[in-house]
Amino acid sequence: MEIKEEGTSEEGQHFLPAAQANDPEDIQFTSIQKSPNEPQLEFILACKDLVAPVSDRKLNTVVQVSVIHPVEQTLTRYSSTEIVEGTKDPLFLTGVTFPSDYPIYEETRIKLTVYDVKDKPHDTIRTSVLPEHKDPPPEVARSFLGCASFKVGELLKSKEQLLSLSLRTSDGGKVVGTIEVSLVKMGEIEDGDTDHITTDVQGQKCALVYDSTAPESLSGKENLPFMNAVLRNPVCKLYRFPTSDNKWMRIREQMSESILSFHIPKELISLHIKEDLCRNQELKELGDLSPHWDNLRNNVLSHCDQMVTMYQDILTELSKETGSSFKSSSSKGEKTLEFVPINLHLQRMQVHSPHLKDALYDVITVGAPAAHFQGFKNGGLRKLLHRFETERRNTGYQFIYYSPENTAKAKEVLSSINQLQPLVATHADLLLTSASQHSPDSLRSSLKLLSEKTELFVHAFKDQLVRSALLALYTARPGGILRKPPSPKVSTEEKSSQHDSPQQLRRQDSIPHHSDYDEEEWDRVWANVGKSLNCIIAKVDKLIERDSRNDKSTGGDSSKDGDADPNLEDSLTSHPREDWYEQLHPLILTLKECMAEVVNRAKQSLTFVLLQELAYSLPQCLMLTLRRDIVFSQALAGLVCGFIIKLHTSLHDPGFLQQLHTVGLIVQYEGLLSTYSDEIGMLEDMAVGISDLRKVAFKITEATSNDVLPVLTGRREHYVVEVKLPATVFESLPLQIKEGQLLHVYPVLFNVGINEQQTLAERFGDVSLQESINQENFELVQEYYSIFMEKMPPDYISHFQEQNDLKGLLDNLHQNIQAKKRKNVEIMWLAATICRKLNGIRFTCCKSAKDRTSMSVTLEQCSILRDEHQLHKDFFIRALDCMRREGCRIENVLKNIKCRRYAFNMLQLMAFPKCYRPPEGTYGKADT
């Protein structure tokens, strides 16, 4: 039967068309039995006794792997091994792996084609781009040696799970050697030395917990919806490398997209729209203002309405991206995708070595959070915010100056008001419900909750900012009169007087005293809430006391209470069996009315504070808000993805869970941006975006449906991410987490530029931005370490210190930061090591997370294999080249620019540290 070739160009691991996976004919295929979320099939290759076309030539061998579907008989080029030089018996370190959702069956045929590469540096493009039945074009400089094929079922059912196949020439005649195919199951021990292939294979599930063997339940079906809601389109690679004692270790490399790339930005933009609409409504409800302030308000509202419309348009466009989980580097300048992180992926390395526990290492790779569409002509957020604040403080203008801290405080108090007022009202209603049931125990419980929430409500207004804001609003009223709706319970007279025109206010760091303004009037209004609560407490105490006396009495007179309030006593004696509801209802109404009065005044005054920030340099202020929202959205999407992955892989680690709710998690970002040209602005954006992640907290809840996507709540000053877990998993969590305790993160950023632009910055420019960022974030790491050592249990700390010398690592990191050495990449290595030892979440970022990021994560993976898993020292460079040439990161490049070349040239690479240079033949000019 003729085999038709799938026409492809620059392809990697890709899926057959749906029609092939679901054949229209009713032919039944035999599925491969596997564990959930595990690759369906993995095997490794070796050749023996290859015959060279020319007798004196040493072969440089590569194997191309293709898939032949059993019905369509179409051939799909799938992957290839690395090139092994100078031997007729090549043993390949790069294996072949088929992901869990790849349409492969026992009837599927695998074709293996062996080539001799004559000019390795020019063999840049994977063999999959070549026509299957034709000799390679002359410019590729490689020749066909032989091919063989087998059915998947033959390998699975083979006695030793090993096939030894004869390699034949294209006409099927001459035998040119043998190729051995060995089935691999991660978790098995591969016996024997590294100079030959072994076939002793037994079944075992792979580990999914960092540095420990995964519990069985972690791979169970209850977690499938959880992980499938986060990860998409996995790319898997398989390697085997020798250890220092000549044993084999197996490594599975996986790269997955995340649906959170689009889900989190959409959630966040929806919250921004809701918050901004609420703020605009609050501005409208400020009441009468003098002409100057009223004009400013109208101008602000006009611009803010335009912002809301723009956010709504962006959300509409993003909502059209249904099912999207990836934004390519070539799309980083698209306006409709501004809020979406660039090239976000989970990069995972799973290691099984003969003498150590299975281990898992995760890094989130993502483009540096930055506003690419906005551009970097005037710098990034760090510079723009500083300049904006300096101008507000030092330039004369007709507004009232509030510091960023006071503005943030105003937003915080407004948020507390919006949260606490409905809570107090709810608990007040519950108190009335308990009263109607005439249940003393229920009444006491309801009163306790009402008291707690009301005290929090009252405490929120203690800040001096509220007082100064009330006076500021007073001066902004027509004629300087503070006008307010009448209070139902507390009546006060407002003195009116003429005041100087507000146009005369200039560069005021505080509100001037106004002789006609009654500062104590606010205290009286505010105190009425507490007094109302005290009346309710006293009434409840009397009702319960009276009820207790009635229970003890057999119908006689109640005992005398000389200290009782006469009014309350009259009420009690007039109701032998009191109607508690009727007696408490008026007091509850009073409490609610007093609260409404306080809320009305406070919200108006604090909204006036926010008006000052918006009114000054209005377009610039809103553009800064937009830019900050964009950068934060990109950073938040990556953080949520990293948190969920870390949580999933550590669910059965008691130490991690205790650290999570006791201390929180450190989140370490490795930046590779230069401090030159546009990348300075990107780094300035990134620094602010990562710092803003401190206002994010996580809460874990039990999933009540199959929808386990995280839910975002809050406003710009504070966000809570609700992470849902399946019921069986949720029940195993510590009580503090199950009760909804907020879980905090400590984001830190260390940046070291490594490219040719950084060379220019170091010799002719300025690297102070990088130095400042590294020093500031080192202090944050020290702070986290101190909290960690203080709050974690002594027995845990004792064991932790035995296993890790964190203090030595921190001292070394500090010395390297102070050294001011050019391209000191040891800063990044030390920061990454500290993060891993502290159970943190690792990120690696460059401009687009494609080229420099690929060099960094592959170097990190091989360094871990060397330092933690005894990778043979002679194989370090070869392992590094394997991962960079044939691993997941070259697939990432292909996904982004449709070309399998890292975007470096020879001159650029001369400026790179040697360990960050890709192997020859994998880089060059790419048509993106």
Curated annotation (Swiss-Prot):
- Where would I find the C2 domain in this sequence? 23-165
User: What regulates the activity here?
Assistant: Strongly inhibited by inositol hexakisphosphate.
Q: What class of enzyme is it?
A: hydrolase
Where composition is biased (Basic and acidic residues), the residues are 1-13, 506-516, 548-563
The pathway that the record names for this protein is: Signal transduction; phosphatidylinositol signaling pathway
Give the signal sequence positions.
Answer: none
**Catalyzed reactions:** a 1,2-diacyl-sn-glycero-3-phospho-(1D-myo-inositol-3,4-bisphosphate) + H2O = a 1,2-diacyl-sn-glycero-3-phospho-(1D-myo-inositol-3-phosphate) + phosphate; 1D-myo-inositol 3,4-bisphosphate + H2O = 1D-myo-inositol 3-phosphate + phosphate; 1D-myo-inositol 1,3,4-trisphosphate + H2O = 1D-myo-inositol 1,3-bisphosphate + phosphate
Which Gene Ontology BP terms does the record give? intracellular calcium ion homeostasis; negative regulation of osteoclast differentiation; phosphatidylinositol dephosphorylation; regulation of bone remodeling; regulation of nucleocytoplasmic transport; regulation of phosphatidylinositol 3-kinase/protein kinase B signal transduction
Q: Which UniProt keywords apply?
A: Hydrolase, Lipid metabolism
A Gene Ontology molecular-function term? phosphatidylinositol trisphosphate phosphatase activity
Stretches the record annotates as Disordered: 1-23, 481-516, 548-575
The pH note for this entry is: Optimum pH is 7-8.
Give Gene Ontology CC terms: cytoplasm
Biological function:
Catalyzes the hydrolysis of the 4-position phosphate of phosphatidylinositol 3,4-bisphosphate, inositol 1,3,4-trisphosphate and inositol 3,4-bisphosphate. Plays a role in the late stages of macropinocytosis by dephosphorylating phosphatidylinositol 3,4-bisphosphate in membrane ruffles. The lipid phosphatase activity is critical for tumor suppressor function. Antagonizes the PI3K-AKT/PKB signaling pathway by dephosphorylating phosphoinositides and thereby modulating cell cycle progression and cell survival.
Under the heading PANTHER family, the entry gives: AGAP000124-PA, INOSITOL POLYPHOSPHATE 4-PHOSPHATASE TYPE II
**What protein family is recorded?**
Belongs to the inositol 3,4-bisphosphate 4-phosphatase family.
What's this protein's name? Type II inositol 3,4-bisphosphate 4-phosphatase
Tell me the organism.
Rattus norvegicus (Rat)
